[in-house]
Amino acid sequence: DNQGRTFVTGVIEGAPAHAVGVLVGDEIVSADNRPFRPVGSFRGKVGSPVSLEIRRASGAAPITISVSPADLHPNEMFLRGLKESARIIVTDKARIGYVHVWSYASRRIQSALEDLMTDGPLKDADALVWDLRGGWGGAQPQYLDLFNPRAPTMQVTGRNGETGFVDVKWRKPVAMLINEGTRSGKEVLAYGFKEYRLGELIGHRTEGAVLAATAFLTGDDGLLLLAVEDVLVDGQRLEGVGVTPTIEVPFDWRYAAGGDPQLDRAVQVLARA
């Protein structure tokens, strides 16, 4: 933040931080008794425990958490995060499904999402919270067709008896979560979701970072993203503009202790749907 403190803004399900109980909003004070540096504090320590001092409330004494960094492939990490995020939130009025799509950089992500809806924990939900906050982009506009109720879904069975679904469609209420970490192809999905009134868009305006880019290593441990293609969506420019939600919900994640007012609002809206 503007005071030089480091806060956790997202915890990917199934990753080492999630496994040891790190929460959104935690301030990371130190690592192995040294001031915390993102990436640098974990460099060369894969598989070895690192002692993190975490402050969970403003002015509170830090607590110590031991975490072992892992060598993770991003697409595998995001795929596992997607699957492990899927759950049912039970309310007095409805069973609300929840899933967090951290990245669409692999086609396997969309297939896994469809499987969660047809054969996984989301299949019996009355409504769905589709969380696109944080992570990477990579989404294609046609992924929105998953929420097009006017197209058919096919169920096919092979000679071996195995059954699968083709062109899966979600025909129940859905809300999308967005924030300033929603970028690139996810912003295209957010635009279409809002423009075609597929459901409520809840949270904060997206980043406005839509241009296609190529990454270059700079030689000093840096990474330069250089725009290589202009992008218009339905003739409109989202770059530098972003997509605004239909329901604005502020979220100051500092010392949130895992609380999530944007998700809480989405559940409230869908429970009334």
What are the residue ranges of the model-derived segments?
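Low-complexity, Gly/Ser/Thr/Pro-rich intrinsically disordered linker/tail segments
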Residues: 253-273
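C-terminal structured "cap/appendage" subdomains that terminate the fold
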Residues: 215-240, 245-246
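Generic structural signal for buried aliphatic residues
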Residues: 28-29, 50, 238
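Cleft-lining beta-strand/loop regions that shape enzyme active-site pockets
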Residues: 10, 35, 40-219, 255, ...
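PDZ/PDZ-like domain segments forming the peptide/carboxylate-binding groove
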Residues: 1-37, 229
